[in-house]
């Protein structure tokens, strides 16, 4: 069971994060509760999107406005059916997997890759200078 412990989400965009979407039931339950509490937009994010019960439920909830986007990584197979959904965003992790493999092959530390603080500060500096962020 899920118990809501936060403050008001009314009018706010909310991000639901979990390690895995198997059937998706738990995330859908949370999304329904957030919409009941008048969240403006609901985004579902997961590392591994398995969608073991198919996409019908996600299609329905997207069409009814209960979820706005679903984001998962390409660390597991993504069907063409999933990739074609208007609400689905593929988070490409290829670059990071390649960097991890490269660091391991060169006996280098992974801490720089795993700690995002430096990258965040560099992006903020670019933003402050008015540069385009890609």
Describe the role of every protein-language-model region.
Residues 1-134:
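PRPP-associated nucleotide enzymes
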């Amino acid at each position: 069971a899920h118990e809501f412990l936060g403050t008001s989400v009314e009018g706010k965009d909310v991000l639901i994060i979990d390690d895995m979407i198997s059937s998706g039931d738990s995330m859908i339950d949370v999304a329904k509760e957030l919409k009941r509490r008048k969240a403006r937009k609901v985004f579902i994010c997961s590392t591994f999107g398995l969608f073991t019960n198919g996409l019908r439920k996600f299609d329905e909830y997207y069409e009814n406005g209960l979820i706005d986007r679903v984001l998962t990584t390409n660390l597991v197979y993504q069907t063409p059916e999933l990739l074609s959904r208007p609400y689905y965003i593929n988070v490409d992790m290829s670059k990071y997997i390649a960097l991890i493999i490269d660091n391991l092959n060169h006996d280098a530390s992974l801490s720089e890759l795993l700690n995002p603080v430096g990258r965040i500060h560099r992006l903020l500096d670019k933003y402050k200078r008015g540069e385009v962020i890609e």
